[in-house]
């Protein structure tokens, strides 16, 4: 394929119909390749901005600022494998398990941002927000529409499963969503509870075993152990303020 033919293919992919209608004239111009480059770059930029707004990732600490020495246990190689996004190609899931404050949400947001940069659709939500929203819908048609909304993204991040307890209906709704996404799109879950304790998160729910089974099938489970980094930062801030007060008095 010649360079000019390759430019024609790119122009068709961009639906530049006006340019294509005058291709014979445009082909002789020295600016044709630059024009198509500009259009592709601008569409890529606008697509990323649109997907960033829709993803609701929020502000987060970039990996360059993450203290890998703080967790007592965290398989960095396994996390970096998740950052490669290979699990999205296979439509498998990822689970980050660990106590409060060890960086699960930060790591999940970095994976979500990486997926966005690479052109994937992403949606980030907390378990509480997701399940409260679904449970509040008062018609089957509205529920089906909202389930399709959450089933659609290439990556759905459900943060903070286990921080609250939920009813049987909440459990059924989560199972329905996970089932819709199963082997079609990837789901990333952060939780402070090992799976053996999920019956306490969804007490008396009959679907808990099936829910966990669908989530963990072929999933990458990354366990993180350690003390709360947020507590560490709070203690450091308190100590700094105390030093400043002592200095002001001296």
Where are each of the predicted segments found?
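Generic structural signal for secondary-structure transition and capping sites
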Residues: 16-19, 41, 87, 155, ...
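Interdomain "pre-motor" coupling segment immediately N-terminal to P-loop NTPase/helicase cores
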Residues: 8-59
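Clamp-loader machinery-focused feature within the broader ASCE/P-loop NTPase space
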Residues: 48-81, 89
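Conserved P-loop
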Residues: 74-152, 199-201
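Extended, charged alpha-helical coiled-coil/arm scaffolds that mediate oligomerization and mechanical coupling
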Residues: 2-7
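Short, conserved catalytic/metal-binding motifs centered on acidic residues
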Residues: 15, 66, 159, 215
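Conserved phosphate/pyrophosphate-binding and hydrolysis machinery centered on Walker-type P-loop NTPases
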Residues: 25-29, 38, 56-57, 69-72, ...
């Amino acid at each position: 394929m010649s360079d000019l033919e390759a430019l024609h293919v790119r122009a068709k992919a961009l639906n530049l119909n006006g340019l294509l209608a005058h291709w014979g004239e445009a082909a002789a111009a020295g600016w044709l390749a630059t024009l198509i480059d500009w259009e592709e770059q601008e569409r890529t930029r606008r697509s990323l901005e649109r997907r960033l707004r829709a993803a609701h990732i929020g502000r987060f600490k970039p990996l360059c600022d993450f203290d890998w020495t703080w967790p007592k246990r965290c398989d960095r190689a396994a996390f970096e494998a998740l950052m490669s996004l290979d699990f999205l190609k296979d439509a498998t899931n990822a689970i980050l398990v660990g106590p409060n404050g060890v960086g699960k949400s930060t790591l999940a947001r970095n994976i979500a941002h990486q997926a966005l940069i690479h052109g994937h659709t992403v949606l980030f939500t907390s378990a509480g927000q997701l399940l409260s929203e679904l449970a509040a819908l008062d018609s089957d048609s509205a529920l089906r529409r909202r389930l399709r909304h959450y089933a659609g993204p290439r990556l759905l991040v459900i943060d903070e499963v286990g921080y609250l307890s939920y009813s049987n209906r909440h459990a059924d709704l989560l199972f329905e969503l996970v089932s819709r996404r199963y082997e079609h799109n990837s789901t990333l879950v952060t939780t402070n509870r090992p799976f053996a304790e999920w019956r306490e998160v969804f007490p008396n729910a009959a679907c808990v075993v099936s829910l966990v089974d669908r989530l963990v099938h072929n999933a990458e489970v990354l366990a993180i152990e350690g003390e709360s980094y947020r507590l560490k930062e709070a203690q450091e801030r308190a100590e700094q303020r105390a030093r400043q007060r002592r200095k002001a008095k001296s």
